[in-house]
């Protein structure tokens, strides 16, 4: 079908052709147009105008403050949207990076009250002020820097309070020591010879299971002793040698005189009772004196450590921990002289006072030591990525060439706390002299080989003399992480509350403390009078 319109528009002629599918031709004067082309052109421009209208409306809603009345301006504004990016997309990050990279001092933030305190405050202020990229970056930097400063201060305060809590003697323990010392002076039953005269030969009899506990904490020692004897299948074969210092000897003797653990044999001795320690110069005492002098000069005290604003909080925590009295305690170094302290014994199990024994330990004597001296649990393998990820590089400073050329940073570390020592094999080595040689080297280097603890020199001294034992015998970390599973801890032979959260402190983890507290007798008159809680 064709449609013809006369030039004068007086008549229209319809000619039947090939139907509607043919082109419709319009004649106006001498011109001829395709009606289909006109139709599709109008349709295209209709959609284009609608699209432009929608984009310009969205731009207005987004809050673009710049007016745009010309088509050229509108084109500039719509071009980035059509292309899917802004024209200055490369400049915005660049401007932000420049602002963020500029250092911001603490003084610039001091006394400022206009810095947003929360993310919600920050977003509200940015929307209200309609900030550009630089202003946005500046406000963001100020807020994050302020939060970092506050977080750092809070962390350091936490570490300082934990240091004070873990290093100080709780008044309950002080009370217990005083009451027992008084009891020792007025009550003959608190001054018994330990052990009784007829049991003294068993102290050097290698047919018995000999355990050594060095502690100046009466409450902790009582829990270790009670848990050891209660869980032993043959308690009559147990001999526990308790070593303490001069000031704690009388209270410790009073406690175990009034709280016997028969049929086990308990010996309580002070360091000054050992002839070996009272004759001539003792390396451990000399090393401790030097160590104390160097630490006092090197550290400067907790106030100096905390006042350092440039130090990482984790480093601050490590330095505070190094100030702990236990690292300069003779009780902590005494294990290196076990062969001299017990010259008649061939094998002993050395126990720390922050452990709890949950099973019979006599099978430890059946472990084949393969000629090695120290039976210990390794601490580089296990599900706990914090406690069981320790290698030599975790304790020793391998940036020091002396350490780097002598040891392998990837070598697996092991733990103190519950160790089987073959004293007969030990006496054939130079372990003790090696220990003191490296202690002296560390002091000469201003503690640059390692910074705290007796384990680092122990790792060096016992290097090549360690027999790995099953992790079942010694579970660590109960004083470090609250995430430790109670069920896992309950199934271990020995649980070790190494770390600051000792079970006798208020900062102990509540769900783990019952493992230790169940060996306290809440009805005991000394425990009750000093308000020592079992839970």
UniProtKB/Swiss-Prot annotation:
Localisation per UniProt entry: Golgi apparatus membrane
MF terms in GO: polygalacturonate 4-alpha-galacturonosyltransferase activity
Annotated Pfam families: Glyco_transf_8 (PF01501)
Membrane topology (UniProt): Single-pass type II membrane protein
Lumenal side stretches: 59-535
Classification via InterPro entries: GAUT (IPR029993), Glyco_trans_8 (IPR002495), Nucleotide-diphossugar_trans (IPR029044)
Identification of the protein by name: Probable galacturonosyltransferase 12
Organism: Arabidopsis thaliana
Organism ancestry: Eukaryota, Viridiplantae, Streptophyta, Embryophyta, Tracheophyta
